[in-house]
Amino acid sequence: MIMKKALAVVVFGGALFAAGAAFAARQKPALPDFAHWTATELKGYEGPLREKVAGEHRTSSVKLADYGSSNVAISHREANGIPEVHAHMDDYFVVESGEASLVVGGDVVNPKLVEPNETRGDSIKGGEKKRLVAGDVVHIPTGMPHQLLVEKGKRFTYFVIKVKAK
C-alpha cells in the first residue's frame, strides 16, 4: 500500500513538473529589441523601393526599426545623394545590390544646418572616393562628411544602421 502511494506521488509529481515546464516554455518573454532580417526579406524591399523613388535625388527608404539609441532602414538610390554630416550619429552601410561611390572626409561646400545635428551642403571638397558594391560594409563616424554618388542609369540599395555616438 505504501509503495502504491509513493508511486502515485512520483507519477503525479512528474506530471505536474512536465505541465509546469510546458507552461513556462510558452510563457518565455519575447527577446526585447531583437530583430532578424533575412537576406530574402531585405532583397524583397528593392522592388517596392524602386517603385517609390522620387525627387531630384531619386531615393526612397523604409525605416525598419527605431531603438532610441539606434535605428535601421533600407534605402535605394538612383542618383547622387546630398553631402551630409551627422553631429551625433555613426552610419553603417551594408550594400545589398548595385554600385555607387562614397565620398568621405574633406569639407562640405556651402554647409547648412537643415535640422538639429544634421548638416547638408552642395558638394564635398577634398574627400576620398570609395567604390561600393554588393556585400561591402562601411562605417562613417560622427562628424565625417559623406555623400553617395550613383552613376546615371545605375541603382544602389543598402541597409543603413544609425547609432548615436557617445
In which residue ranges do the predicted regions lie?
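His/acidic/aromatic-lined binding-pocket segments of jelly-roll/cupin-type domains
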Residues: E84, D91-V94, K129-K130, V137-V138
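An anionic, turn-rich surface loop/hairpin at beta-sheet edges
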Residues: P111-V133
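A short hydrophobic beta-strand segment most commonly corresponding to one strand
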Residues: G153-K166
